[in-house]
From Swiss-Prot:
Species of the source: Polaromonas sp. (strain JS666 / ATCC BAA-500)
Gene3D superfamilies in the record: Dihydrodipicolinate Reductase, domain 2, NAD(P)-binding Rossmann-like Domain
Active-site residues, record numbering mapped to chain: C132
UniProtKB keywords: Aromatic hydrocarbons catabolism, NAD, Oxidoreductase, Plasmid
The protein, known as: Acetaldehyde dehydrogenase
This protein's record includes keyword Endoplasmic reticulum: no
GO annotation, biological process: catabolic process
Entries under CDD domains matching the protein: ALDH_C
GO molecular function terms attached to this record: acetaldehyde dehydrogenase (acetylating) activity; NAD binding
EC number(s) reported in the record: 1.2.1.10
C-alpha cells in the first residue's frame, strides 16, 4: 500500500504508551502513517524519538496539534493521556471530524474489544479501549458467555509495578469501574468485578490475568474449554504474547455449600477459572510490560480496521 493510501494519525500523549504505539504504527500498521506526536513536556523521550523519526511533533498539547500544518490531513487520533484530560481533547477533535481512539478509562465512547465487538462500532466517532485488564480478560468472559449464562465474572489483573506509570496509578479507580462495566456490557456477564494488583517483585514479572466465571452447574464444560481456546487464538493474532498459562479449570459449587458473591448473595453452580499471561513485544517497552503492549496492540488493531473502512468508503 502506498503512503497516499494510508491515513494519517496523531498520538496525544508522548509517554510510554504513546511512544510504543508510535513504533507499532510505523512498523506494523497496514493502513496508517504517523501524522503527529503530541505532548506537553518538550524534553520527553517520546517527542525526541518522534522527532528523530521524522514525525511532526508539538509539546503544546491539543492546541499545538490543531496548529500543525498537516492537521487537516489527520483522520484518526489516539488519546494516551488521562481520563481527566480526554473530555477536552475529544471535544476539540470531534469539531474537526477526527475519529478518536481513547486509551484512557474516560469511556466517552462505546467500549471496544477488537476481537469481540469492533465490527459493530466502526462508525463510532469515539471508541474506548477499556483497560489493559479489560483487553486481556473480557474476551474470555465473552467466550464463556457464548456457551453458558455467566451469572458473575471476576477478573484479577496483576502487572509489574515498574510498568505502572503515573497515569496508570492516577486512574486505579477508573480502571476498576471501567473494566467492571465492560465485563457486563461487552463480556455479557450479568455481574462483573475487576481487581488490579501492582506486583513489586524483582525481577519484574509479566502481566498475569485470572478470570473467574460462575455459570450454571450443567453447562457444557468441553464447549466452554474449546470456546476459550478459540478466543485466545483470536486475541493472539494481534497480541502475539497473549497465551493460556494452563488448561481451563472447572469447580462445582454444590447447592449444599454455596458461596457468597457480593451484590448477588449465596450462589451455587460451576466456577470456570482461566489463567492468562501476556508478554510484551518489546518494541519500546520491556517484555514484562504486557499490560501496556496489549493496549497499544488492541488500539492499533482497531485503528487499522477503522482506517480500512474509511479508505474503502472513499
Amino acid at each position: 500500500m502506498t503512503k497516499s493510501q494510508r491515513l494519517q494519525v496523531a498520538i496525544i500523549g508522548s509517554g510510554n504508551i504513546g511512544t510504543d504505539l508510535m513504533i507499532k504504527v510505523m512498523r506494523n500498521s497496514k493502513h496508517l502513517s504517523m501524522g503527529a506526536m503530541v505532548g506537553i513536556d518538550a524534553a520527553s523521550d517520546g517527542l525526541a524519538r518522534a522527532g528523530r523519526l521524522g514525525v511532526p511533533v508539538t509539546h503544546e498539547g491539543i492546541t499545538g496539534l490543531v496548529g500543525l500544518p498537516n492537521f487537516g490531513d489527520i483522520r484518526i487520533a489516539f488519546d494516551a493521556t488521562s481520563a481527566g484530560a480526554h473530555a477536552g481533547h475529544n471535544e476539540v477533535l470531534q469539531r474537526h471530524g477526527v475519529k478518536v481512539i481513547d486509551l484512557t478509562p474516560a469511556a466517552i465512547g462505546p467500549y471496544v474489544i477488537p476481537v469481540v465487538n469492533l465490527e459493530e462500532q466502526l462508525s463510532s466517532p469515539n471508541i474506548n479501549m477499556v483497560t489493559c485488564g479489560g483487553q486481556a480478560t473480557i474476551p474470555i468472559v465473552r467466550a464463556v458467555s457464548q456457551i453458558a449464562r455467566v451469572r458473575y465474572a471476576e477478573i484479577v489483573a496483576s502487572i509489574a509495578s515498574k510498568s505502572a506509570g503515573p497515569g496508570t496509578r492516577a486512574n486505579i479507580d477508573e480502571f476498576t469501574e471501567t473494566t467492571s462495566a465492560a465485563i457486563v456490557s461487552v463480556g455479557r456477564a450479568e455481574h462483573g468485578k475487576a481487581i488490579i494488583v501492582l506486583n513489586p517483585a524483582e525481577p519484574s514479572l509479566m502481566m498475569r490475568d485470572t478470570v473467574f466465571c460462575l455459570v450454571d452447574a450443567d453447562a457444557d464444560q468441553e464447549a466452554i474449554r474449546l470456546s476459550v481456546r478459540d478466543m485466545v487464538r483470536s486475541v493472539a493474532a494481534y497480541v502475539p504474547g497473549y497465551r493460556l498459562k494452563q488448561d481451563v479449570q472447572f469447580d462445582v459449587i454444590p447447592d449444599k455449600a454455596p458461596v457468597n458473591v457480593p451484590g448477588i448473595g449465596r450462589v451455587s453452580g460451576l466456577k470456570v477459572s482461566v489463567f492468562l499471561e501476556v508478554e510484551g513485544a518489546a518494541h519500546y517497552l520491556p517484555a514484562y510490560a504486557g499490560n501496556l503492549d496489549i493496549m497499544t496492540s488492541a488500539a492499533l488493531a482497531a485503528a487499522d480496521k477503522i482506517a480500512a473502512s474509511l479508505i474503502t468508503a472513499r
